[in-house]
Amino acid sequence: MPSTTTAAWRVGADVGGTFTDVVALGPDGRIVPMKVLSTPPAYGEGVVAATTAAITTAGASPAEVGAMLHGTTVATNAILEKDGAVTALVTTSGFRDVLELGRLRRPTLYDLGWSKPPPLVPRRRRAELNGRIHADGTVDPPHTPEDVARLAMRIRGSGAAAVAVCLVNSYLRADEERRVADELRSLLPGRYVTASVDLGAEPGEFERTSTAVVNSYVGPVVQDYLTALERDLVAAGVTVPLLVMQSGGGLLDAGKVGRDRSRSSSPDRRPV
């Protein structure tokens, strides 16, 4: 976590659907709270307004802010409102239905009328890659650049703005999955690409696939929000790094949250 200046103001901001709350803590222990109306859809404007108001009320200047901490439910809202990025999935041949197969567990075992929620990536945007990582870590047949290029062309035609990559047994060969993801980034500039092993190189194809899909689904939304918020804070005179609260209670630089940890930002978020 980036270091903060102790002899300066520390500001914490939390955004809700109705109000945006900011608390400024001075170097002398003084606390200045501020509440303003939230500003959807540009919620960052409310954060900047509340921060500026709190610091001004304290008789300080934005340049005296030594730490800027932020909790946000932008990713949660994108999932609940089905307002995330159009996402594609790249997986091993024969495994594109893993999102729908899931696990045996279901929330209402005896409810005959229960319907499984539709996956965030429909079947038409799930692409199968030839090649296979086996249980011993060997790759046979290999994932060729030609096959990756073929899938990239299909993804480009689907209109997807984000891509999740999850290959079977990739936790044994993280380098192989990352290579495929890097090739897709090169072939699909401007798309948000997630490799499942970058979130958790662990066994469990359904868990890794669904987590990578959620990360890609909300990633562009979170990235755009945090980029705009950082820009507006700097314009207002707050130049310290923006730190975002994670589901584990820790803080992460906003640049890393937007890049590869979108699905775990904010304290009320849990991996899906």
Residue ranges and their predicted role:
Residues 2-272:
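N-terminally biased helix-coil "hinge/interface" segments that flank
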